[in-house]
Amino acid sequence: WIMGHMVNAIYQIDEFVNLGANSIETDVSFDDNANPEYTYHGIPCDCGRSCLKWENYNDFLKGLRSATTPGNSKYQSKLILVVFDLKTGSLYDNQASEAGKKLAKNLLKHYWNNGNNGGGAYIVLSIPDLNHYPLIKGFTDTLKQEGHPELLEKVGYDFSGNDAVGDVAKAYKKAGVSGHVWQSDGITNCLLRGLTRVKEAVANRDSGNGYINKVYYWTVDKRATTRDALDAGVDGVMTNYPDVIADVMNEAAYKNKVRLATYEDSPWVTFKK
């Protein structure tokens, strides 16, 4: 999965997919009442990027729905996965469950079209704080209460705080999650970060009894870093330059080893070599 980083304006969906991304990451900010409000990152952000692009969250969802609904004039068949980077740092811990409920209602209405031929991409809810694990239950309970438990088949989870792998496993246990787990590791492109924890996550994924299904590394903008990440066995790389990642995947060392994921590749099933 080539994951376009910080895609917060509707026009950027096409821009990143046309550069080679089959997945995008979108920031979600919340108001004081835990309503998802804007697709907005803010300052500071990655070097070389504008931090200030935004849409109202519900408007973005409608644009995303158009891009991921077969038959729509705006349909992008390559776009199969969307990571919502949930900026829950602005919320009190006791608002996490409420944020999950409201997120579920927004997605159900504006993205999934109340279960009636809505957007078809897989969704990953990425949460920065392990203490906010109740967001997951708020989300899953709400979809069930609204009569759409089948949509949970399209939803996965990520804790993005670079916490110890064992601590992340405990948070999932508390949240009642087993499966559909992506594990992120990374840092802004302005700084360097080694691959120690990525390798630990990959080992958990491949152990047969770990909690992780897929591992992604962020933010990867350079060819050398891309090669290191692919060599470490990641499933996804998040990038500001999808074309750079696509180029590396076409190099002789990689073109027979890795390929771009398609809709038929489940993002919840651990790939067995």
Curated annotation (Swiss-Prot):
It is found in: Secreted. This is Dermonecrotic toxin LhSicTox-alphaIA2avi. Keywords: Cytolysis, Dermonecrotic toxin, Disulfide bond, Hemolysis, Lipid degradation, Lipid metabolism, Lyase, Magnesium, Metal-binding, Secreted, Toxin. Transmembrane segments: none annotated. Binds 1 Mg(2+) ion per subunit. CDD domains: GDPD_like_SMaseD_PLD. Disulfide bonds join C45-C51, C47-C190. GO terms for cellular component: extracellular region. The active site is at H5, H41 (nucleophile). Its cofactor is Mg(2+). It comes from Loxosceles hirsuta (Recluse spider). Expressed by the venom gland.
